[in-house]
Amino acid sequence: AATTFQKPLSVSYAMQRAMRTMSSPGRGGYAAARAAEETAFRCRSLAAELFGVPSPEQVVFTSNATHALNIAIRSLVPEGGRVAVSGYEHNAVTRPLHALGARIKVAASPLFDRAALLRAFENSISPELDAVVCTHVSNVFGFVLPIEEIAALCRAERVPLIVDASQSAGI
């Protein structure tokens, strides 16, 4: 995660190598640009495989998770739109929703009670929502939300789901 201190030495080496040997992916036919483009595509392919995305071309890299969440939220939620969230959301979710003037419905439940949280989402999700935005794992508590079940509720009501997987990607 971006907030972790002391990245593994392999990360430092990979970044140094990239800065020495790569440049401008997709922007030229010279060796450094081709190397960067091939590396980016390999990364997209691995990410697509990890997350079950049908095609590497559907994988987008952003500066960080906050940027990605802003893109997703601002793409699906209009100004004044209706959204359901859990009570575990990070500021990267709540701030853009408030900036949009979204009408936010919190699926409130006692802390760490997955069954109660799922019931709260059952009562909160309806077709008039523009989206449900939900973390998978709380960055504060480490609580794992029942994301598969929440996703099923969203599918049943045909409501888009934005998942903040910052703390759980790959597990």
Please give the residue ranges for each predicted region.
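Pyridoxal 5′-phosphate
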Residues: 1-171
